[in-house]
Amino acid sequence: MKHPLVRNKVATITLLLGLLAATPGYSQSTPKFAVIPLTLSDNVSLPLSNEILLDVSVYDPDFVSSVLGQWSGIEVVGHRDGVLKLSISDNMTAVADAQSPHPQYLANTFVIDYKEASVKEVVSAFLAEHGKGVIAKKVGSSTSHEESKLESNPGEIGAKIEAFVANYITEPSYIHNFSFASTVAKSRSGDCTEYAVLSGAVARALAIPARVVIGTIIVEDDSSVEAIGHAWNEFWLDGHWRRIDAAMYSAEPLKKYYLPSHILNNEGPGYALGLSKAVLNAPERITVVSEKDR
């Protein structure tokens, strides 16, 4: 008999793949990025510090540890009985594994289809609003966003894209479709995945390497803390991966901790398999603990 955790993960992945395979067109339905059960141990109280200790129940602790090793500000100290013990900073950043990112993060893909007319219109609107930050090279008699160069501070450009997409999507929804960038550009609606694919499309159209990261975000406000399945971006700017999160733009005053599960590297027709990995590697439960608990 399968362990209950295994049964739950298999059922979720089966549902995910079935929905993706059965839904035609450019907008596929996926299961809800759920709220993940999170508790505070008796020795922990709010407000949380900039670095916190977590006990995270996961399906495959060794694999999840290898994924988390791609970011600094997250330290895995061990695991036991499917519970990963780690510390995480609210200033977590990706580790640069090369002087420049893989060309795939500039590609026009099935998911981040920035060469579609609807996305080009969004990019043009961005340039009209923030054109001073971008120089577009001339290719023949036309202007190519694909060969654009950054004129201003790289971090400033990332922040401008983040703010622009946050305001461009006028109908935030929780129906949890996984729509491609061109669909989001037309509908101007969606949840965190839609914000992420459109942000990635705008960045790539401006020759900024961009990728989508899927994982969990722990959000604290004045009186509570919760963990939610989430998607965000990382842009390659000034030799570093910088986190961009248009979906959480309005929540800037809140304290946030990002716990990645998967980088969406497969953006082709088989992208659903990548999403299934994200589901499999997602936390089942999270407990914020103290040194006394360990």
Regions inferred by a protein language model and the residue ranges of each:
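Bacterial N-terminal signal peptides that target proteins for export
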Residues: 2-12
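Bacterial N-terminal signal peptides
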Residues: 13-22
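Intrinsically disordered, low-complexity N-terminal segments that are enriched in acidic
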Residues: 25-95, 143, 148
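Catalytic cores of extracellular degradative/oxidative enzymes
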Residues: 90-103, 182, 223
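Secondary-structure boundary elements
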Residues: 100-190, 198, 265-267, 276-294
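Cysteine-centered nucleophilic/redox motifs
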Residues: 161, 189-217, 233
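Catalytic cysteine-centered active-site loop
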Residues: 171-179, 212-222
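Active-site rim recognition segments
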Residues: 218-294
